[in-house]
């Protein structure tokens, strides 16, 4: 049985992750953290009834992780929180699933160093949906044959998402850029200027959109659109739980969803 701890357990993603953890026959929830609602049952927020696991103050992360004997910590919070909490967990010997987006290169370096020092296993991905990771594979292949086409990425999310562009859009841009030998990124368009070899990246924040991503390859007289639409956050929670089961069987190191899915 895998002992799982969840950060941000009272939030939209965290509560879905709790729900999926308790529905797994190979996992049990042993700790749940947030910045408020201390002492309340984690099952209350996941709407699954009482679980006997109270919400703990994230300030007590290291102590609770050790006392609960957590094997893996799942973190879908915010960049400023993850850069503090992930190193604490790694140095406590707890494996990590990180779905936080908006990490700067400097923050990512801090996290990577802590994982290496702690000799734990971690999956770090901007998107845990199986479909999105297949989408990544498809656009990589398409870009190899369409390097002379104009390439644009359009993403849309709900109006509460703080970071823009999305981590998924940035990962898509990196995949395409690597496939075509490098391109400059342009975020939105404004003014009058010549265009070079670039990838345009455009973000929309509106309503309750779960997550839409479109990659547009446009040539003369034709265009190809490759699209992924998320209808529910459940796909991210299910993918994170799948990754947590997988990572606990791996040697220490930093992995991606490509590794989890064998893509």
Curated annotation (Swiss-Prot):
Coiled coil: none annotated. It comes from the Archaea. It is found in: Cytoplasm. It catalyses: (S)-2,3,4,5-tetrahydrodipicolinate + NAD(+) + H2O = (2S,4S)-4-hydroxy-2,3,4,5-tetrahydrodipicolinate + NADH + H(+); (S)-2,3,4,5-tetrahydrodipicolinate + NADP(+) + H2O = (2S,4S)-4-hydroxy-2,3,4,5-tetrahydrodipicolinate + NADPH + H(+). Pfam families: DapB_C (PF05173), DapB_N (PF01113). GO terms for molecular function: 4-hydroxy-tetrahydrodipicolinate reductase; NAD binding; NADP binding; oxidoreductase activity, acting on CH or CH2 groups, NAD or NADP as acceptor. GO terms for biological process: diaminopimelate biosynthetic process; lysine biosynthetic process via diaminopimelate. The active site is at 157 (proton donor/acceptor), 161 (proton donor). CDD domains: DHDPR_N. NAD(+) binds at residues 8-13, 34, 99-101, 125-128. Belongs to the DapB family. Catalyzes the conversion of 4-hydroxy-tetrahydrodipicolinate (HTPA) to tetrahydrodipicolinate. PANTHER family: 4-HYDROXY-TETRAHYDRODIPICOLINATE REDUCTASE 1, CHLOROPLASTIC-RELATED, DIHYDRODIPICOLINATE REDUCTASE. This is 4-hydroxy-tetrahydrodipicolinate reductase. It comes from Methanosarcina barkeri (strain Fusaro / DSM 804). The lineage of its organism: Archaea, Methanobacteriati, Methanobacteriota, Stenosarchaea group, Methanomicrobia.
């Amino acid at each position: 049985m895998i002992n799982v701890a969840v950060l941000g357990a009272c939030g939209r993603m965290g509560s879905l992750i709790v729900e999926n953890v308790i529905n797994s026959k190979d996992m049990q929830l042993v700790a749940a953290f947030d910045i408020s609602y201390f002492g309340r049952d984690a099952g209350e927020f996941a709407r699954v009834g009482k679980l006997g696991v109270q919400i703990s103050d994230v300030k007590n992360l290291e102590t609770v992780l050790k006392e609960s004997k957590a094997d893996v910590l799942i973190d879908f919070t915010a960049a400023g929180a993850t850069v503090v909490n992930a190193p604490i967990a790694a140095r406590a010997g707890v494996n990590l699933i990180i779905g936080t987006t908006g990490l700067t290169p400097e923050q990512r370096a801090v996290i990577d160093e802590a994982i290496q020092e702690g000799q734990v296993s971690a999956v770090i991905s901007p998107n845990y949906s199986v479909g999105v990771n297949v989408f990544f594979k498809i656009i990589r292949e398409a870009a190899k044959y369409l390097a002379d086409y104009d390439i644009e990425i359009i993403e849309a999310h709900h109006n509460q998402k703080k970071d823009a562009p999305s981590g998924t859009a940035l990962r898509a841009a990196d995949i395409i850029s690597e496939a075509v030998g490098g391109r400059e990124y342009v975020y939105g368009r404004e003014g009058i200027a010549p265009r070079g070899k670039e990838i345009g990246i455009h973000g929309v924040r509106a309503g309750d959109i779960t997550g839409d991503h479109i990659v547009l390859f446009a040539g003369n007289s034709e265009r190809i659109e490759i699209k992924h639409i998320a209808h529910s956050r459940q796909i991210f929670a299910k993918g994170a739980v799948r990754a947590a089961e997988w990572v606990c069987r791996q040697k220490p190191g930093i992995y991606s969803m490509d590794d989890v899915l064998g893509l």
